Amino acid sequence: IISYVRPDGTLVARKFEAWSNQGAYASHGHSIVAKGMGAFPQLYPCDNLECDCWTVYTNRPAAGAMRGYGIPQAMWAGECHIDDICQAIGMEPMEFRRKNLMPVGYTDGFSRNELYADTFNQCMDKGMAMLDYQRKYREYQNQTGPVRRGVGLAVFWYNTAVWPISLESSSCRMVLNQDGSLQFQTGETEIGQGCDTAYSQMVADAVGIPVEDVHVVSTQDTDVTPFGTGAYASRQTYIGGFSIMQTALALRERILQIAHEQTRMPVSVLDLVDGKIIRKEDGR
C-alpha cells in the first residue's frame, strides 16, 4: 500500500496491490483477492486511486475462502498503514480516521454499496469510551525502554456476497405436506452459521405458518436440490433469503388461490395466519 497524504491528513492518492495464493487448481482465488481490492478504497474514499491484484498458482493445495473472504487481509494491512501515516505526519489516529472515513450517503462506484447510517462514528465513540482511549493515548506517548504500553483502535468494513466480481444466484423448492407443515430445499447449505434457522423464520413469516411446521434438510442432496452457488462470502441469509422469500410468497398465493376455489371468496379478503386461512375483516 502506498498513500500520498497532505500535512492536514487529507488523502490525495493511494495505490493498492495484492496477491492471492490459488494453490494448484482454480478455486475462489480471483474473487477473494478482488473482494479485498474492492473493500480497500471504500473505507477511505480517495479521488486518485490505483488497485491491482493477481491470482497466483502455486504448488500447494487448492486455496479457498474461510471466514472473511479476502476483506480481513486488506483491512489488516490498510489499518496498520493508516497508523504508520498518522505517526509520520504527527496526527492522532482516530482524528485521521474520522476525517477520511466514507461519509453517510457515500456510494462506491464499483460495488454500488451505499453507507446509510453514521455507524462508523457511533462504534468509534463507544469503543473509545470503553477503552478510556484519550487518556491512555496521551499517557502512553514518549515512552522509553524495552517494554512499552500502547492503545489503538481499527476500523473494519465488510459486505456480503461477491457481486459484481462473480455471479450471484440462488434457488429454492418448497413442498406443502398433507398435515399443513412445509419442507424446503435450497442449495445454500448450512455449515454451522445458523442460516437454516434464519431461513425457517423467513418461510414461516412469509407463508404464515408456525416456525415449528417448517422443516429443512441441512444435508442437501445435489441430485434433487435446486442449484445454489455455495456457502461463502457471508452470502447465505442475504442471497439465499431472496429466493426463499420469493418462493414462500408464491406458495402463500397458491394456497390462498386454492382457498378461493373452495370457498368462492376473493383472494383479496383472505389471509394466512398461524397456519389458518382466515378472513381479513374479522379474523375468522
Residue ranges and their predicted role:
Residues 173-183, 266-284:
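C-terminal, non-catalytic interaction/recognition modules in large multi-subunit enzymes and RNPs
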Residues 31-41, 65-100, 122, 126, ...:
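Alpha-helical support elements that line or immediately flank enzyme active sites
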Residues 5, 18-23, 50, 102-106, ...:
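Acidic, glycine-rich active-site loops and adjacent beta-strand->loop/helix elements
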Residues 2-80, 159-169, 235-238:
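Glycine-rich loop/linker segments at domain edges
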Residues 100-181:
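Helix-loop-helix junctions that connect adjacent transmembrane helices in secondary transporters/permeases
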Residues 20, 49-54, 171-175, 210-236:
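Flexible glycine/proline-rich, aromatic-decorated loop/lid segments
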Residues 1-23, 241-278:
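Phosphate/diphosphate-binding loops
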Residues 12-17, 46, 93-102, 138-155, ...:
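Beta-strand segments within the central parallel beta-sheet cores of soluble alpha/beta enzyme folds
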